[in-house]
């Protein structure tokens, strides 16, 4: 679909590169990029000033639809006060827990032609919060669209090698080794099978919804429109999967003690956190979300069907169709057993081509990133679990305001907060970045609640 709306992408990570390439392929829209001031951002700014081009290539399964491509960036800004002029579409390509801070800085009055704000990787309640902020800015007619998650798996290509196979499966690749990445060059190794999306009006036929459907269809991604923002956002996979794994005791030990041996987020103990107790937390958190979603007037998901059919399928010899289709009705212990079997089935990619020794691709070798220090010697937490903690805390606060109990979420957060406090006590508060010491989750939860109540 030909679409020429001037588009400003807020965020400049690997996902933004894939997105920019896809937008360029659907029309000759003017493209802008925002990135907050940082070491990586300064390198990107200097590079684009000389060569205003970003590069992308596909690898593995993604090569079927993503060839080597480049895209011209017409405008780069590193201050949100510069987000002015004739931009008609804003796309949030920053982590969902950053939406509030980013949108608070937008000079809305200086965007008179704005038509839409698109959330590339939303969390539950993100759309309501954005809608509330737009209403307060006098932008009630701006269309808000939530995607259930980012539609691909995209990484930076690292500077020391052009061989993308050498890039490690680090869930925070480049976070601790900024100099090793090329912030203008990325590769995509897979696309999602299905993405859920919705706008605040439940209008699946809007021009922007149709355009997004066409963009994703380039990569044979099914798009399922939902009746409202929350209905799409309930399918955010990281909300379900990351907290039980990233906030497990063994993962937190690896996170806060980087000198110890590595851990892998999706491996079974002792290499990773996956064990029956952690899988019980996964099932328990899904039950927490079920209660919250039902209170918000949204139907819960079939967790096993979502994990298998929409994300990473496993052979039926491991997880039967009966388990998948009847998952909500299974007894709790059988649910947990089915989930445990699924995660053991994904220790390797069962559909990869085995090597000469008969070994399949080590799908679960996703290394747990650890705390790290910046150029000012301040300690930071990597995106996983910091983003997940913020999202979970916001939802727990929202649940409390709506008299919904979420015991598993509460226990996971308490475990994290105890581990964080012990770390801060060990290194000293003065040596910690402010992101370790506070957040705006309470404000975000209050805004979501306010917007939800105004619509019910």
UniProtKB/Swiss-Prot annotation:
Catalytic activity line of the entry: yersinopine + NADP(+) + H2O = (2S)-2-amino-4-{[(1S)-1-carboxy-2-(1H-imidazol-4-yl)ethyl]amino}butanoate + pyruvate + NADPH + H(+)
Residues given in the record as NADP(+) binding sites: 12-15, 35-40, 154
Annotated catalytic residues: 242
GO molecular function: oxidoreductase activity
Stored SUPFAM superfamilies: NAD(P)-binding Rossmann-fold domains
Presence of keyword Methyltransferase: no
Domain of life according to the entry: Bacteria
Gene3D superfamilies named in the record: NAD(P)-binding Rossmann-like Domain
EC number(s) from the headed UniProt entry: 1.5.1.-
Listed InterPro entries: NAD(P)-bd_dom_sf, Opine_metallophore_DH
Keywords, alphabetical: NADP, Oxidoreductase
Cited function: Catalyzes the NADPH-dependent reductive condensation of pyruvate to the intermediate formed by the adjacently encoded enzyme y2836, namely (2S)-2-amino-4-{[(1S)-1-carboxy-2-(1H-imidazol-4-yl)ethyl]amino}butanoate, leading to the production of yersinopine. This is the last step in the biosynthesis of the metallophore yersinopine, which is involved in metal acquisition and thus enables bacterial growth inside the host, where metal access is limited. Therefore, this enzyme probably contributes to Yersinia virulence.
Family listed: Belongs to the staphylopine dehydrogenase family.
Subunit and interaction comment: Homodimer.
Stated name of the protein: Yersinopine synthase
């Amino acid at each position: 679909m030909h679409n020429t709306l001037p588009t400003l992408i807020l965020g400049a990570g690997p996902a933004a590169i894939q997105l920019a390439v896809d937008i360029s392929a659907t029309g000759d829209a003017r493209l802008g990029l925002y990135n907050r001031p940082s070491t990586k951002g300064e390198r990107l700014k200097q590079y684009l000033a000389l060569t205003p081009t970003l590069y992308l290539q596909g690898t593995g399964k993604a090569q079927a639809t993503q060839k080597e491509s480049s895209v011209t960036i017409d405008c780069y800004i590193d201050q949100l006060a510069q987000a002015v002029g004739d931009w008609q579409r804003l796309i949030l390509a920053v982590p969902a827990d950053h939406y509030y801070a980013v949108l608070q800085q937008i000079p809305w009055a200086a965007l008179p032609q704005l038509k839409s704000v698109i959330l590339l990787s939303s969390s539950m309640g993100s759309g309501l919060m954005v809608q509330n902020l737009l209403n307060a800015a006098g932008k009630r007619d701006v269309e808000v669209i939530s995607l259930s998650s980012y539609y691909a798996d995209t990484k930076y290509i690292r500077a020391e090698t052009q061989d993308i196979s050498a890039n490690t499966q680090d869930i925070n690749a480049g976070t601790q080794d900024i100099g090793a990445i090329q912030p203008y060059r990325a590769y995509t190794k897979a696309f999602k099978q299905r993405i859920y999306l919705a706008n605040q009006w439940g209008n699946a036929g809007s021009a922007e919804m149709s355009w997004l459907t066409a963009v994703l269809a380039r990569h044979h991604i099914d798009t399922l429109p939902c009746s409202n923002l929350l209905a799409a956002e309930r399918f955010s996979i990281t909300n379900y999967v990351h907290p039980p794994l990233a906030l497990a005791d063994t993962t937190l030990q690896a996170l806060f003690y980087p000198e110890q041996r590595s851990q892998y987020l999706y491996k079974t103990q002792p290499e990773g956190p996956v064990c029956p107790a952690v899988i019980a937390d996964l099932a328990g958190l899904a039950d927490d979300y079920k209660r919250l979603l039902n209170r918000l007037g949204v139907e819960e998901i079939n967790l096993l069907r979502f994990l298998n059919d929409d994300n990473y399928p496993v052979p039926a010899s491991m997880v039967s169709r009966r388990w998948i289709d009847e998952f909500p009705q299974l007894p709790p212990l059988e649910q947990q057993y089915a989930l445990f079997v699924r995660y053991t089935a994904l220790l390797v990619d069962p559909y990869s081509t085995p090597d000469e020794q008969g070994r399949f691709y080590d799908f679960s070798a996703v290394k747990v990133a650890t705390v790290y220090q910046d150029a000012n010697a301040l300690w930071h937490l990597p995106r996983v679990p910091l983003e997940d903690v913020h999202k979970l805390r916001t939802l727990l606060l929202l649940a409390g305001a709506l008299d919904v109990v979420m015991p598993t979420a509460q226990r996971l957060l308490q475990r994290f907060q105890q581990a964080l406090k012990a770390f801060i006590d060990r290194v000293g508060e003065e040596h910690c970045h402010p992101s370790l010491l506070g957040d705006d989750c309470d404000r975000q939860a209050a805004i979501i609640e306010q917007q939800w109540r105004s619509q019910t």
